[in-house]
């Protein structure tokens, strides 16, 4: 469909088709938020075109912002003077060129001629800088335009360069083989295999640019550019980002916008030797090590005498080629490409897409990236992301607080602590005589920390953790300082230990050592540690047994860290958090191996504060953002954002208002529906749910999705129905499917559910489609779309409150009660948190249905507590506006029957 330009007020919004009125409102409000430099919380239900509204609204603002800036620069260059002090929009001067421009306050008492002279000089300097920037920008635009029209010539030039490089490499290898001979080459390989694992000399005051994410060497000077004003758009998963890039391509801005997709090394690496390492941490460390080796090799060649011979032998990455990466960067900016296209281009050009994407950031107008790269400060810095005066849009942000909390919370087990200690001891035994004193000092400190962590759990580092029974069991919560004192490690500088781990990459060396040699013990220690060696072997993956073992539904498969020390480094870093912002949870189970130490982040705002402080504007968007009080209080208020800077926007749905959300307060036998912890296990309550579902399945043609508060409760109800015969009555109306706890079985169940509905729709019979019994917080309550016949009715059984007895939740509640003020007439912040967690889960679950304009479904909330005004206020606006509260079941089932009969007749 042809692109159309919509005018909302005085603003023109290009759009691929005629937008809904709610999309126009969304874009206009988004434009105002970005222009005024606010923090916006935007809610737009699924099916309302949120992605296109974000794209067209934000890029329209960026278009106008750049136009105003160009006009202002032209005026300044024409008049040769700086900006006036009383100009209304000082935000036009955002780049570094405007720093220290006209208007810099002068010391009081200076003669007027001095002030005038300095001001004139500043104005001339500003004009000169603007001229340089204008010339640089013009050069960049011309280069990108040439690329767009000369793609074939560029490919030919790349192929020619590759052939020349391959010829040169072959000649170089031939010369080396002639010079060294086969014996020397074999000796070199044997030495390098061993030497790679030995720690290089550590200099604590040395600042290596690679480890901190800065430029690798001087070759990048030519590639460094000014960071123009841009929009950072982030989402949770790479698939969501790929879908967003696809929407950008379809938009009116698709041909002109300079977009770059960022990802992790694991997603963008094209070096198969590095990719084969599997673990994200191993890939990161190996990549940085190769770039460091390249830098040190170059430095060593200049100085003629490298410190260690192994630094010369370490191979540099063949894909880290500045000329090729520059070409790849320009090609990526010339037209919109997703991550798969970037990978293909990187392989073809033999250039690294990961570093290429970093080089493209300064000139890009739209940067697409996953949550972790934006919200984790070290990752952000390593990627070369600069947020100063930029715009950030966080999409799918309903779980933003949980994401930040989870990203900075770390849990280590007793078995991991013991395994890391054993590996490190073996490493020191093998290479101790070759290590410098500073390396030995830090390794002994790490060993001491591991020993004390095991001791604080009540175990002994020298014994097998699987066979160690702890005298005390239970959960204990400590402040960070109390934990350090109790562990007797308060005298160790954890900041220095953390820095050593990062710079020396000891965990990668240790992983390489254990991977190459396995569990190596001296003959002196063999008898004492024989049992422990057996334990270490038991931790290794056993492919044959894993394939033969039946799938365990009670536990989803969790990826194991590549090296226990890599994981423990994260725990050490977490212990450097401010005392008031986190807690340490000691969980002592039956054995040491099952016991854990967990750092719990209480204040996610401490990691979000820098984002809102540096950015011009931040937009937090999602399909269901209610209740928003958590965002306002836990993230924004605690990050120092003033309430006046926060703007809320919630648009309606594109669907007709006749889709009925119902609150049913009592069952068929007039049993009040209140699924509290004390009442939900009563037989009459479980019977009421079964009878209500039987009636709903009798009047709803299509799929019915019923959500329970937990897997345990679902199984309990299912067993009760089976025993009492209700399950058979339900099965006579709809085929029953049950959500598995094992994540890898979810797709299989969904496929069977979908096929059943499709088959029943074609062959009308007594069984009308299917009933899916799901769990709030499970895989099917988030990210799965039950559109059309897959979800004609969504039922929520009770209110899925989190476990109030959880030590983590209790500590979080206490923290909020102490930190946040209590509003008059409102519940304490801790209690409000529990209710908000419940309602967020409800909103996510019921939002699985009604996915587009012509879709329809009935939403049934089975619990009289939903009728309370404070609870209703936390439902999404489009549901809240049309919800009906039914005191008894009769009128409720009649309304559902009428609704579906009318929909069936009109379809």
UniProtKB/Swiss-Prot annotation:
UniProt modified residues of type Phosphoserine: 264
Record-level GO BP terms: establishment of sister chromatid cohesion; nucleobase-containing compound metabolic process
Location of this chain's protein in the cell: Nucleus, Nucleolus
Entry's family note: Belongs to the DEAD box helicase family. DEAH subfamily. DDX11/CHL1 sub-subfamily.
Residues annotated as domain Helicase ATP-binding: 9-447
GO cellular component: nucleolus; nucleus
Binding-site residues, [4Fe-4S] cluster: 269, 287, 317, 352
Gene behind the chain: DDX11L8
Cofactor dependency: [4Fe-4S] cluster
Cofactor, free-text remark: Binds 1 [4Fe-4S] cluster.
Pfam families: DEAD_2 (PF06733), Helicase_C_2 (PF13307)
Gene3D superfamilies registered for this protein in UniProt: P-loop containing nucleotide triphosphate hydrolases
Keyword list, A-Z: ATP-binding, DNA-binding, Helicase, Hydrolase, Iron, Iron-sulfur, Isomerase, Metal-binding, Nucleotide-binding, Nucleus, Phosphoprotein, RNA-binding
Residue numbers spanned by region Disordered: 202-222, 291-314
Subcellular location, principal: nucleus
Motif (DEAH): 395-398
Alphabetized SMART domains for the sequence: DEXDc2, HELICc2
Its job: Putative DNA helicase.
Official protein name in the record: Putative ATP-dependent DNA helicase DDX11-like protein 8
Residues reported in the UniProt entry to bind ATP: 44-51
Organism for this UniProt entry: Homo sapiens (Human)
Basic and acidic residues bias: start-end ranges: 206-217, 291-306
Regions annotated as coiled coil: none
EC number: 5.6.2.-
CDD domains: SF2_C_XPD
Keyword Lyase: no
MF (Gene Ontology): ATP binding; DNA binding; DNA helicase activity; hydrolase activity, acting on acid anhydrides, in phosphorus-containing anhydrides; iron-sulfur cluster binding; metal ion binding; RNA binding; RNA helicase activity
């Amino acid at each position: 469909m042809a692109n159309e330009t919509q005018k909302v007020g005085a603003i023109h919004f290009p759009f691929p088709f005629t937008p809904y009125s709610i999309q126009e409102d969304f874009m206009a409000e988004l434009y105002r938020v970005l222009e005024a430099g606010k923090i916006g919380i935007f809610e737009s239900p699924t099916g309302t075109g949120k992605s296109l509204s974000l794209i067209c609204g934000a890029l329209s603002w960026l278009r106008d912002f750049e136009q105003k800036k160009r006009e202002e620069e032209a005026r300044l260059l024409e008049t040769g003077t700086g900006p006036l002090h009383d100009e209304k929009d000082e935000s036009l001067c955002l780049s570094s060129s405007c720093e220290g421009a006209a208007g810099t306050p002068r010391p009081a008492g200076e003669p007027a001629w001095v002030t005038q002279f300095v001001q004139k000089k500043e104005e001339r300097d500003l004009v000169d800088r603007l001229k340089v920037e204008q010339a640089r920008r013009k050069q960049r635009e011309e280069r990108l335009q040439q690329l767009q029209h000369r793609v074939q010539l560029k490919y030919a030039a790349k192929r020619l360069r590759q052939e020349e490089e391959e010829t040169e490499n072959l000649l170089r290898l031939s010369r080396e083989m002639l010079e060294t001979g086969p014996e020397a080459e074999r000796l070199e390989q044997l030495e390098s295999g061993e030497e790679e694992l030995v720690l290089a000399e550590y200099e604590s005051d040395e600042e290596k640019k690679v480890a901190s994410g800065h430029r690798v060497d001087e070759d990048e000077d030519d590639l460094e550019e000014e960071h123009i004003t841009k929009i950072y758009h982030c989402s949770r998963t790479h698939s969501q980002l790929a879908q967003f890039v696809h929407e950008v391509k379809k938009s009116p801005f698709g041909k002109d916008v300079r977009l770059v997709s960022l990802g992790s090394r694991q997603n963008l690496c094209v070096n198969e030797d590095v990719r084969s390492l599997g673990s994200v941490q191993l890939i990161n460390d190996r990549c940085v090590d190769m770039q460091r080796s390249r830098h040190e090799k170059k430095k060593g060649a200049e100085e003629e005498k490298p410190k260690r011979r192994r630094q010369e032998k370490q191979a540099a990455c063949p894909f880290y080629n500045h000329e090729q990466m520059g070409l790849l960067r320009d090609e990526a900016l010339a037209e919109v490409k997703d991550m798969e296209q970037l990978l293909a281009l990187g392989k073809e050009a033999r250039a690294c897409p990961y570093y290429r994407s970093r080089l493209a950031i300064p000139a890009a107008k739209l940067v697409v990236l996953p949550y972790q790269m934006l919200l984790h400060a070290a990752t952000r810095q390593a990627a070369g992301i600069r947020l100063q005066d930029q715009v950030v849009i966080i999409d799918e942000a309903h779980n933003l607080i949980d994401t930040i909390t989870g990203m900075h919370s770390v849990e280590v087990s007793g078995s991991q602590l013991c395994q890391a200690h054993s590996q490190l001891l073996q490493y020191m035994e093998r290479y101790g005589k070759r290590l410098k004193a500073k390396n030995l000092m830090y390794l002994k400190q790490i060993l001491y920390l591991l020993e004390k962590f095991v001791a604080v759990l009540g175990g002994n580092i020298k014994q097998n953790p699987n066979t160690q029974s702890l005298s005390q069991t239970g959960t204990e919560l400590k402040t960070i300082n109390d934990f350090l004192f109790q562990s007797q490690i308060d005298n160790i500088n954890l900041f220095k230990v953390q820095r050593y781990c990062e710079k020396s990459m000891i965990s990668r060396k240790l992983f390489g050592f254990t991977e190459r040699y396995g569990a190596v013990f001296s003959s002196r220690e063999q008898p004492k540690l024989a049992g422990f060696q057996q334990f270490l072997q038991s931790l290794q993956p056993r492919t044959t047994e894993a394939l033969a073992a039946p799938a365990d539904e009670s536990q989803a498969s969790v990826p194991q860290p590549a090296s226990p020390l890599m994981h423990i480094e994260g725990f050490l870093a977490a212990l450097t958090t401010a005392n008031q912002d986190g807690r340490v949870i000691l969980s002592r189970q039956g054995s040491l191996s099952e016991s854990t130490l967990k750092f719990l982040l209480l204040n996610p705002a401490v990691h979000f504060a820098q984002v809102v402080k540096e950015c011009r504007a931040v937009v937090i968007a999602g399909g269901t953002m209610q209740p928003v009080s958590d965002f306002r209080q836990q993230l924004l208020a605690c990050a120092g954002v003033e309430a006046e800077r926060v703007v809320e926007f919630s648009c309606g749905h594109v669907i007709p208002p006749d889709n009925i959300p119902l609150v049913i307060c009592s069952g068929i036998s007039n049993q009040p529906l209140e699924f509290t912890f004390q009442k939900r296990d009563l037989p009459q309550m479980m019977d009421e749910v079964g009878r209500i579902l039987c009636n709903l399945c009798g009047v709803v043609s299509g799929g019915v999705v019923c959500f329970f508060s937990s897997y345990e409760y679902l199984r309990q109800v299912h067993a009760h129905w089976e025993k009492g015969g209700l399950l058979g009555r339900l099965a006579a109306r709809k085929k029953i499917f049950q959500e598995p706890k094992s994540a890898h079985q979810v797709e299989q169940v969904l496929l069977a559910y979908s096929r059943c509905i499709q088959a029943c729709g074609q062959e009308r019979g007594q069984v009308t489609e299917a009933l899916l019994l799901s769990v709030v917080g499970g895989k099917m309550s988030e990210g799965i779309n039950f559109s059309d016949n897959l979800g004609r009715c969504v039922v929520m059984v009770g209110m899925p409150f989190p476990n109030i007895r959880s030590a983590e939740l209790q500590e979080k509640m206490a923290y909020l009660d102490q930190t946040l003020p209590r509003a008059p007439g409102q519940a304490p912040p801790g209690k409000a948190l529990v209710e908000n967690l419940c309602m967020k889960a409800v909103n996510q679950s019921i939002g699985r249905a009604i996915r587009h304009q012509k879709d329809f479904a009935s939403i049934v909330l089975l619990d009289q507590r939903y009728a309370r005004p404070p609870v209703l206020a936390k439902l999404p606006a489009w549901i809240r506006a049309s919800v009906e509260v039914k005191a008894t079941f009769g009128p409720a089932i009649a309304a559902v029957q009428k609704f579906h009969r009318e929909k069936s007749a009109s379809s």
